[in-house]
Amino acid sequence: MTTALDQLKQYTTVVADTGDFQQLAQYKPQDATTNPSLILKAVQKDAYKPILEKTVRDHRDEPADFIIDRLLIAFGTEILKLIPGRVSTEVDARLSFDTQRSIDKGRELIKLYEDAGIGRERILIKLASTWEGIRAAEVLQKEGIKCNMTLLFSLVQAAASAEAGAQLISPFVGRIYDWYKKQAGADWDEAKNGGANDPGVQSVRRIYTYYKTFGYNTEVMGASFRTTSQITELAGCDLLTISPDLLQKLQDSNDTVERKLSPDALHDKPTERVAIDEASFRFQLNDEAMATEKLSEGIRVFAADAVKLEKLIDSLR
C-alpha cells in the first residue's frame, strides 16, 4: 500500500518544519523550514548541544545576536546536507517593524551561507508579513535573495507579498484554526468546522485561488498544522511544511489522499485584485481581528524565544 505521505508528494512539495535535522532523512522532504522557536527547542536536546557549544566557543567575545546568526547558519548547513532543496532561515522577529535592518540582516545571513560554500539559490530568508517585512522582501528579491513571508494570516498580507515579488508565503493554517476555536469556546463544533470547512484550510484555499487567478509566481506553502486532516485537505498546494510528528502520522497511514487544490480547477475565483498601498494594507489587516492578533502574538513569541536563546548563549560563555 502507498502511504498517505507518498500520495501527498504526488501533488505537493513536502517540506519538513523542524530544527531537529536528525529526523529529516526518514521522511525525504524536498525542503526544510526553521524558526527561532524550533532552533531553541533543538539546542536544548543533547544531540544538538555540541553545535551550540562550538558556536559559542568559536565566537565567545561576540554579541549574542552575532552568535545566533552563526547558530542559524550552522543548523541550516547541516539541514542542507540531508535535503535536495532549500532551507528557510528566519530574520530576528525583533526587526519585524524595521525595513532597513531586516534588509541588512537578510544580506548578512546570505553572506554567511555563501561564506560556508552554500549558494543563495538554496536559501529562503524568512520575514514576518508586516508592511515593513514585505518592503524588505521587495528589496532583497531584486538582489536575488529569495524570501519566505511568514506569520501570514490574511489575504491582504498574501496579496502584498505577491505584489512585492516574494518567492514564497507561509500561511499559518493551525494558528488560524486555534483562534476561531478559542473564540467559539463551548460553541465550537468540530464536525461542522473541520475538514474542508476548517477556517485555516479555507484561508489557504482562498489565497491559492487568488494567486492562480491573477497569475502570481509566488509559491504558496501551507504551514502550522494541527492535524493530518488539515494537511490532506490542502493536497495540491504548491508546498506544505509539516512537523516531524505529523510527517510520521502520514507515513504510518494508508488512507487515500486526493488532490484538493489545482490551478486547473479553481472555485470562487476573485474578480478584483486586493488594494495594497500602505494605508489600505494597514486598514484591511486591522479590520481582520484574527490576522491582527495572530501576527502580533507570533512576533511576540518568536521575539521572546530569541531572548531565551540569547540568555542560553550567555550562560555558556
UniProtKB/Swiss-Prot annotation:
It catalyses: D-sedoheptulose 7-phosphate + D-glyceraldehyde 3-phosphate = D-erythrose 4-phosphate + beta-D-fructose 6-phosphate. Its EC number is 2.2.1.2. It comes from the Bacteria. InterPro entries: Aldolase_TIM, TAL/FSA, Transaldolase_1, Transaldolase_AS. Homodimer. One of its GO terms (biological process) is carbohydrate metabolic process. One of its GO terms (cellular component) is cytoplasm. It is found in: Cytoplasm. SUPFAM superfamilies: Aldolase. The active site is at 126 (schiff-base intermediate with substrate). It comes from Burkholderia ambifaria (strain MC40-6). The lineage of its organism: Bacteria, Pseudomonadati, Pseudomonadota, Betaproteobacteria, Burkholderiales. The gene is tal. Transaldolase is important for the balance of metabolites in the pentose-phosphate pathway. Its main location: cytoplasm. One of its GO terms (molecular function) is transaldolase activity. The keyword Nucleus does not apply. It is an enzyme of class 2 (transferase). Keywords: Cytoplasm, Pentose shunt, Schiff base, Transferase. The keyword Transferase applies. Belongs to the transaldolase family. Type 1 subfamily. It holds the Pfam family TAL_FSA. Pathway: Carbohydrate degradation; pentose phosphate pathway; D-glyceraldehyde 3-phosphate and beta-D-fructose 6-phosphate from D-ribose 5-phosphate and D-xylulose 5-phosphate (non-oxidative stage): step 2/3. This is Transaldolase.
